[in-house]
A protein has these predicted regions:
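Noncatalytic alpha-helical scaffold of FAD-dependent oxidoreductases
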Residues: 1-255
Length: 255
């Protein structure tokens, strides 16, 4: 398989970070037993990381020992229009600091993605009144039951964290508009936007796909340079460069 990360990579890591051991069958039929359950193993070479990411070229993975995490019992999900990509990166840092590292997901969603999405899936609710040029979908989660305690104002501690961060970011000009889910149904609706976007790209026409990994500090300049260069070649190309901002992984797709 690949060293995939997925939507929650910012909190839990990539496949290599989550895999403690493997069983692999080589091309000649030999079985390699690497099913250690240890988080730290100082013995010999770490062969499992050669197989993870090789996509079957070195052998077939037939079993795996995985690291597991407690499921969050409380979460707060928000969709925000941000000033630009650099503002999105700064917002991520603020949410991480305010929540004590509880960010479950932080997804970059530009306007082109939403334009394509609503062409083919108009029934999906728009998170905000207007479509902003650059947006983020973010979620924080906690395994502490107290984080879900409703106070006299109908608020929870984890939601208060999100509200405070967004309010400060709005005052500082990082955030233009935002909404926080108040129910599971509203949370699901926000996630529908992100999870349906790839399907809309397929319907829109030919898609040039890429999977780019960058340092967070380089994302804003990369995005600006790529947009300028591509638009100079063909202004009609829609740039659907969404992705996991938390680990610097962008699916910089062109439609």
């Amino acid at each position: 398989g690949t060293n995939a990360g997925g939507l929650n990579v910012v909190r839990y890591g990539t496949t290599r970070q989550l895999t403690l051991g493997l069983e692999v069958v080589l091309m000649g039929g030999e079985v390699i037993e690497l099913l250690s359950g240890l988080r730290k193993d100082n013995t010999g070479y770490d062969l499992k990381n050669l197989f993870i990411g090789s996509e079957g070229t070195l052998g077939v993975i037939t079993a795996a020992t995985m690291r597991l995490f407690p499921k969050p019992v409380a979460c707060s999900t928000a969709f925000a229009e941000v000033r630009d990509v650099s503002a999105a990166v700064e917002l991520l840092h603020r949410v991480q600091a305010a929540s004590g590292g509880m960010v479950e997901a932080f997804e970059l969603i530009p306007a082109d993605i939403l334009d394509v999405l609503y062409e083919y899936f108009p029934k999906i609710p728009q998170p905000l009144a207007t479509i902003g040029a650059m947006n983020v979908l973010m979620e924080i989660g906690s395994t502490n039951p107290a984080s879900n305690h409703v106070d006299g104002n109908g608020n929870t501690p984890i939601r208060q964290i999100m509200e405070d961060v967004l309010a400060a970011a709005f005052e500082d000009g990082l955030v233009i508009d935002a909404t926080i889910a108040s129910s599971d149904a509203q949370r699901d609706a926000l996630w529908d936007v992100r999870e349906t976007a790839p399907e809309s790209h397929k319907l829109a026409g030919k898609v040039a796909r890429s999977d780019v990994a960058l340092p967070q500090s380089a994302i804003a300049d990369f995005y600006a340079d790529m947009v300028a260069g591509i638009k100079a070649i063909d202004a009609k190309i829609r740039i659907c460069g969404y992705g996991h901002l938390g680990d610097g992984n962008l699916h910089f797709n062109l439609v």
